[in-house]
């Protein structure tokens, strides 16, 4: 029974896939922004799978993956993030410097065996 329950719990977990369109001349600023999230996200209750920067090819697209046990935990994380001084400072940094031109979020679930 526990194997079935674990697969059901895993199926309910979500991963937020974030696609960023960047100003290609401000990639270094985005990298600073992303590095800050590596500490802020876990502090606020999320699992930061990672951030990915352009290396070859397209120079203005970056990605992030964040995981949560479920949507309720994601919503709790968002509330904690809004109350976190470092998180708000990082949002303000992005807004002030305008290195993110567009952001898309997709909520994914893992396919269970």
Cite the ranges covered by each PLM segment:
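N-terminal beta-strand motif that seeds the catalytic metal site of vicinal oxygen chelate
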Residues: 2-22
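An amphipathic, aromatic/His-enriched active-site/gating alpha helix that lines ligand/cofactor pockets
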Residues: 2-5, 9, 32-49, 67-105
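Short, structured motif recognition centered on aromatic/hydrophobic residues
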Residues: 14-19, 30, 41, 64-65
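Short beta-strand-to-loop capping motifs
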Residues: 19-24, 66-70
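Short, surface-exposed ligand-recognition loops at beta-strand->loop->(often short) alpha-helix junctions
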Residues: 22-32
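Short, solvent-exposed loop/turn elements at beta->coil junctions and helix N-caps
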Residues: 51-54
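Short acidic/glycine-enriched loop/turn segments that link adjacent beta-strands
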Residues: 57-60
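Short, low-order "capping/linker" segments at domain edges
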Residues: 104-113
């Amino acid at each position: 029974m526990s194997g079935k329950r674990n697969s059901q719990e895993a199926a309910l977990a979500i991963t937020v896939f974030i696609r960023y369109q960047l100003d290609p001349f401000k990639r270094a600023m985005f990298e600073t922004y992303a590095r800050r999230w590596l500490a802020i996200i876990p502090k606020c209750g999320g699992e930061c799978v990672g951030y990915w920067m352009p290396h070859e090819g397209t120079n203005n697209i970056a990605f992030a993956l964040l995981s949560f046990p479920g949507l309720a935990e994601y919503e709790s994380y968002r509330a904690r993030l809004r109350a976190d001084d470092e998180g708000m400072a990082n949002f303000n940094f992005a807004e002030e410097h305008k290195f993110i031109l567009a952001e898309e979020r997709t909520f994914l679930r893992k396919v269970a065996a």
